[in-house]
Amino acid sequence: MYLKSLKVENWQCIEYTKPIFENLMLFIGPTNNGKSSIISAIMFFLGYRNLRTKDIRNLDLPLELEGTFQNFSQANYKNLKDFIYKKELTLKIQKFPNYDVQYKIKINRDWKIITEETYREILSHIPILYIPPFQDKKQINFLVNSLFEILKRRNISEDLMVNSLKELANTLQNDYVSKGLYRNLLFEIFRSISEESQKRNHSIIGNTIVFFEEPELYLHPQAEKELYNAFIQLSNLGAQLYISTHSSNFISLKHYKSICIMRKYKEFGSKAFQFKGKLFSGDEVKYFNMNYWINPDRSELFFAKKVILVEGQTDKIVLGYLAKKLGIYKYNYSILECGSKSIIPQFIKLLNAFKIPYIAIYDKDNHYWRTDIEIENSNDKNHSIQRAINFKFGDFIEFENDIEEELYNEKRERKNYKNKPFYALKTVSEEDYIIPARLKEKIEKIYK
């Protein structure tokens, strides 16, 4: 039994949103933009937490949560078949002003009021583990007991593997565990669960939903990447993992359907942004994945307030350096090296899909020493970049003919393009270097 969608209305900082769920969900976005709100809404809907007055965004309006479940095991289907319609089970919680909470289930096309007890009985088919950023002793004990109860229900409680988990859990429950050790023990526990699940070719915690807030805390980058891989493997084998994170090590462009960006607006509060369509086709998939493996740091684009797309290393180094020199550099803007001009449209597709503000910087490449065929080919690539841009949140700047000519304010010979990043940085870092007016204007536009 898997949660597939949840409509959220009038909850905390959310006026209305409806995320669609993958087995692995990655909730990202700036602090105070709604990540905790969407997670708390899911937890309340699943019966894991109580309703508090402050959870209702506007007390004069109804609160409503409506979720749909799919993919039932044989045992689940047998117990819930009376409630399943067209392979889906749909539940609703409503709270009208001055009235008690109502629980409803959709039977065929009609809504039927049910008791809270019946509601919770239905949801008991989805075990839950919750890991907040920090836990006290009582919460740690509850987490450990919940984990072993899940394993017991799945007849894994007497397994040899469970003994090693118990050793880790005993250390976790120690009175003198530091926050750093606590987080590292959680890392070891989930790595063990993932490894054992892979051996058995199914999740040993079944369809459990794991809520894990900020799993990156107190972990070094290599451990973050390994834990993220453990999450991927577990989700592929049947577990449901809902992660909120500020670390690009828990984001992969390959799993873009798992990404849910929370954004906050003055007019209508926080909203979830996802893209469930197909971004690339044919050779685009191969080239994009190859490009990603060359530089996996590109995942940071999902955390940026604005993304600056550039062709190569020279542009990335020089633009950042000159922006600092001009006093306009912004740390919440990410300069993304795409690798080549032909790859830029693919990144634009990705940014368009998630409505992330961006500006694409590319070389016109119409140098006087180029052949007509080279210039025609270059212009085709330039036009493909321009056509890909959604000007609601994207733009472009064209260098004439490349950043080197902009830096030196002169036409460049073909022979002058060896060791470009080194010589470009050497030039702009000289004390008497004056940024040409045309280049300064372009950098100011990039960082506006």
Predicted feature residues:
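Activity-critical C-terminal alpha-helical subdomain
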Residues: 364, 369-434
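The start of beta-strands in P-loop NTPase/AAA+ ATPase cores
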Residues: 17, 127, 208-209, 306, ...
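RecA-like P-loop NTPase motor core
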Residues: 257-366
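ABC ATPase nucleotide-binding domain signature region
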Residues: 56-69, 115-138
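Short glycine-/polar-rich loops that comprise or flank the Walker A/P-loop
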Residues: 60-65, 87-89, 122-128, 239, ...
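Extended helical coiled-coil dimerization/tether regions that scaffold
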Residues: 104-106, 123-212, 373
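Switch/communication elements of ASCE P-loop NTPase nucleotide-binding domains
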Residues: 1-47, 174-297, 317
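Conserved P-loop NTP-binding catalytic core
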Residues: 39-86
